[in-house]
Swiss-Prot record:
It comes from the Bacteria. The active site is at D326. Coiled coil: none annotated. InterPro entries: ATPase_P-typ_cation-transptr_C, ATPase_P-typ_cation-transptr_N, ATPase_P-typ_cyto_dom_N, ATPase_P-typ_P_site, ATPase_P-typ_TM_dom_sf, ATPase_P-typ_transduc_dom_A_sf, Cation_transp_ATPase_P-type, HAD-like_sf. Its EC number is 7.2.2.10. This is Calcium-transporting ATPase.
Length: 890
């Protein structure tokens, strides 16, 4: 039912209730049984045990588990235990990162009011909000949070803050009249109060028409549960890589066994050789190293005031091509601010933003003293006197108690020197006629220390212009002629073109002791002037948008505000290009999902949108192949935040719902912080590419060593445990250190990666194969030289091959830091890498020279002379390629 279109009689009949008696306890019980408690349903929670086991569903992990079974079956228990340990550690890391996952619905539920005043059996009773049922009569006043969806039947100067639900920062004036328009957006339903919104002024009475999941908040909860959770590009690429590697490993195993049996070798030894190759083909440490690299990136992002809630999403930011940003509280400060004051034919600009009383006044671009400009003085003082709000400094922040528009006027007055103490000690409010939606104004009668009295009225400019017979001009009150009215209207249009909300102030001196009625007070006034008010953009957002544009990322503003307001803010932020389009909620309703996908690329601003629209917009960009980041802070943003490839919420002003639905929380609510997060995300992905290149080139080298040996009818140069040691220990430490590499200088000048870019894109596959080939050749040559020198001492030749392979890979790691040459970057820029390489060399020496480990790893001590051979062979692959690149450049 469309309750907002009903009159009071039809409403009471439809809900079967009484304004005098409310509901009986018997009727309440019946309706509770029918509709259920007034609570939001919770989604199914994943148990800790299931969450832990979910960590082992990754394809690469399954491959490693298969390798464990094969190793155990063949009696290679050391290999099996080592692989199991790696898999288990990786699972624990993933479990603890995701433990605090799906809490969105619980946070949404906690927004509900704990208690409300309801009319039951003729008496007003305070009850838990969960006991409300459709048909309950409820009342609410300033400061209350609405407990259910309510059709208002009585409104006294009622204004409700709906920014968390609709995105609008200005409180909505509410009334009890029925609406005649059939199709209105949520923000335009002015005779309803919605669950979770806050009363900022006045009081009201209403009939509950929706509870629990049948509320506007409940619909958001439904969308939140149905919004999908997408895998990240990194997860998809690693899944693809895992499948490639398992196919390679299986083919190699079959090939080795078949060739070996044909050559006359026994089946068991050939199967052992096949498993060795399979182990060599799969980088066992890759899942753990990816997890650690992401974790290290998370730690760096925390220092930059970004908290990552879902680990793989770090990388997603790096390939985001669209940022869909909520305007209110994200691009703007959600703190109404006076920026213009017009009086006596002059317009003053007011600097500063928010509620901090800090900012200068300028006239014709020159800073002025407020004391020298009487019209400005009066505008500021009267704005503070005709005001019921208060601003206090709490924990270093200026906090508003009351209406945001009044907060803006109060702040402007304090900037001009009219402190709270000054106003209260010099003026006394004798009478007040509160604001109501019918009059569209508020009036006070004040008295100063000289017992002079003034009527001061503030309100809608068109209303005050009708009530004013004079206007303050050139230092005195003059006739409010048609010429002056035309000038005032021109100023109004100019301020409106800048998306400023205008408040007019008028006054009239009265006799000492006189206290006129409201009707007498609000006529024959003198128009003093206008204040232009806006929710100002965050100062750092413009630069952040520019840098995102340079990085190939389009920023899209999505807001519940009116088109003109959104357009002005977008232009101020330089977000809207000349060819850019603006689309409102009505236009969105007329387009199907497919039609929106066709036109969405040209749109930069979406205005008057609902939560359903935000979800539709995000999906449209995703259908066009974009990786979408959605930023926001309100309840209304949560479904779209969850649907997006990465959801970004605000840490201070953000609701719990938005935070729990998001993957990334900006601690300082600073839109510009997202730029740093994007930079870090890109760097993390590049670092992951670096260590994938490093690990796979090492594995290619290991595979080729084994294949060369078989083709040349040589014994195995490496045993499985040595290969496993290289993959997990020797390779692992440098790979992790590569994950800590600093970004290259042009990382934010590059276009976003294509979402479907493969792991081996940008010649990575060639680099892996070419480097791996040379590492394999160097290792097998070292093995052949030593083996032919003394065929009886196979363990010594295998140790030489082991040492050559390790050192060749450790030298190669420095080549992986750059897309060009090992000489293009200073190796000492990454001290972690220097430490990792030295540690790996030390561990290699321990395995070779420590007697208790020698039988386990099949190693023996190497003579000093043979170390020259090992070092020389190890250096050949990297420096040979580096030399050829330098020659090619010349």
């Amino acid at each position: 039912m469309k309750f907002h279109e009903m009159g009071q009689t039809d409403l009471l009949e439809a809900t079967n209730t009484s304004m005098k008696q409310g509901l009986t306890e018997k009727e309440v019980k019946k309706r509770l049984d029918k509709h259920g408690p007034n609570e939001l349903q919770e989604g199914k929670k994943t148990s800790a045990l299931l969450l832990f086991f979910a960590q082992f569903k990754d394809f690469m992990v399954l491959v490693l588990l298969a390798a464990t079974l094969i190793s155990g079956f063949l009696g290679e228990y050391v290999d099996a235990v080592a692989i199991i340990a790696i898999v288990f550690v990786n699972g624990i890391l993933g479990f603890f990162q995701e433990r605090r996952a799906e809490q969105s619905l619980q946070a949404l539920k906690e927004l509900s009011t704990p208690h409300v005043m309801a009319l039951r059996e003729g008496s007003w009773t305070k009850i838990p909000s969960k006991e409300l049922v459709p048909g309950d009569i409820v009342k609410f006043t300033s400061g209350d949070r609405i407990g259910a969806d309510v059709r208002i039947v009585e409104a006294r100067s009622l204004e409700i803050e709906e920014s968390a639900l609709t995105g609008e920062s200005i409180p909505v004036v509410k009334h009890a009249d029925k609406l005649k328009k059939p199709d209105v957006s949520l923000g335009d339903i002015t005779n309803m109060a919605f669950m979770g919104t806050i009363v900022t002024r006045g009081s009201g009475v209403g009939v509950v028409v929706g509870t629990g999941m049948n509320t506007a908040m409940g619909k958001i909860a439904d969308m939140l549960e149905s919004a999908g959770t997408l895998s990240t590009p990194l997860q998809r690429r690693l899944e693809q890589l895992g499948k490639i590697l398992i196919v390679v490993a299986l083919l190699l195993t079959v090939l080795v066994v078949a060739v070996g049996v044909i050559q006359g070798h026994d089946l068991y030894s050939m199967f052992l050789a096949g498993v060795s190759l399979a182990v060599a083909a799969i980088p066992e440490g890759l899942p753990a190293i990816v997890t650690v690299a992401l974790s290290l990136g998370v730690q760096r992002m925390i220092k930059q005031k970004s908290i990552v809630r879902k680990l793989p999403a770090v990388e997603t930011l790096g390939c985001a091509s669209i940022i869909c940003s909520d305007k209110t509280g994200t691009m703007t400060q959600n703190k109404m601010t006076v920026t213009h004051v017009w009086s006596g034919g002059k317009t003053w600009r007011v600097a500063g933003a928010g509620y901090e009383p800090k900012g200068s006044f300028t006239l014709n671009e020159k800073e002025i003293s407020v004391n020298e400009h009487k019209p400005l003085q009066q505008m500021l003082l009267f704005g503070a006197l005709c005001n019921n709000s208060n601003i206090e400094k709490r924990d270093g922040e200026y906090v508003l108690d009351g209406d945001p528009t009044e907060g803006a006027l109060l702040t402007a007055a304090r900037k001009g020197g009219f402190s709270k103490e000054f106003v209260e000690s010099n003026y006394r409010v004798i009478e007040e006629f509160p604001f109501d939606s019918a009059r569209k104004m508020m009036t006070v009668i004040v008295e100063n220390q000289d017992r002079k009295r003034y009527i001061i009225t503030k309100g809608a400019p068109d209303v005050l212009m009708q009530r004013s017979s004079r206007i303050y001009y050139d230092g005195s009150a003059a006739l409010f002629s048609n010429e002056r009215k035309a000038e005032t209207e021109a100023v109004l249009r100019h301020l409106a073109s800048q998306a400023l909300r205008t408040i007019a102030v008028a006054y009239r001196p009265i006799k000492a002791g006189e206290t006129p009625s409201m009707e007498q007070a609000e006529k024959d006034l003198t128009m003093l002037g206008l204040s232009g008010i806006i929710d100002p953009p965050r100062p750092e957002v413009r630069q952040a948008i520019k840098e995102c544009r340079e990085a190939g990322i389009k920023t899209v503003m999505i807001t519940g505000d009116h088109v003109e307001t959104a357009k002005a803010i977008a232009k101020d932020l330089r977000l809207l290009p000349k060819s850019g389009k603006i689309m409102d909620g009505k236009m969105l309703n007329e387009l199907s999902q497919e039609e929106l996908s066709h036109v969405v690329e040209d749109v930069y601003v979406f205005a008057r949108v609902s939560p359903e629209h935000k979800l539709k917009i995000v999906k449209a960009y995703q259908e066009n192949g974009h990786i979408v980041a959605m930023t926001g802070d309100g309840v209304n943003d949560a479904p779209a935040i969850k649907q997006a490839d990465i959801g970004v919420s605000m840490g201070i002003t953000g609701t719990d719902v938005a935070k729990e639905a998001s993957s990334l929380v900006l601690v300082d609510d600073n839109f510009a912080t997202i730029k740093s997060a994007i930079k870090e995300g890109r760097n993390i992905y590049e670092n992951i590419r670096k260590f994938i290149r490093y690990l796979l080139a090492s594995n290619v080298g290991e595979i080729l060593v084994m294949l060369f040996a078989m083709l040349l009818a040589l014994p195995l140069p490496l045993v499985p445990i040595q290969i496993l040691w290289v993959n997990l220990v020797t390779d692992g430490l440098p790979a992790m250190a590569l994950g800590m590499d600093q970004p290259e200088g042009d990382v934010m000048k590059r276009k976003p990666r294509h979402p479907k870019e493969g792991v081996f894109a940008r010649k990575l596959g060639w680099k892996v194969v070419s480097r791996g080939f040379l590492i394999g050749v160097a290792t097998i040559l070292a093995f052949i030289i030593v083996y032919h020198r003394n065929p009886e001492n196979l363990a010594y030749a295998q140790t030489i091959a082991f040492a050559t392979l390790v050192l060749a890979q450790l030298i190669h790691v420095f080549d992986c830091r750059s897309e060009t040459s090992v000489f293009s970057r200073n190796p000492f820029q990454n001290l972690y890498l220097i430490g990792a390489v030295l540690s790996s060399i030390l561990l290699m020496l321990v395995v070779i020279y420590y007697p208790p480990l020698q039988p386990i790893f099949h190693t023996v001590a190497i003579t000093p002379g043979d170390w020259m051979l090992v070092i020389g062979m190890s250096a050949i692959p990297t420096f040979l390629l580096a030399g050829s690149l330098l020659t090619r450049k010349k």
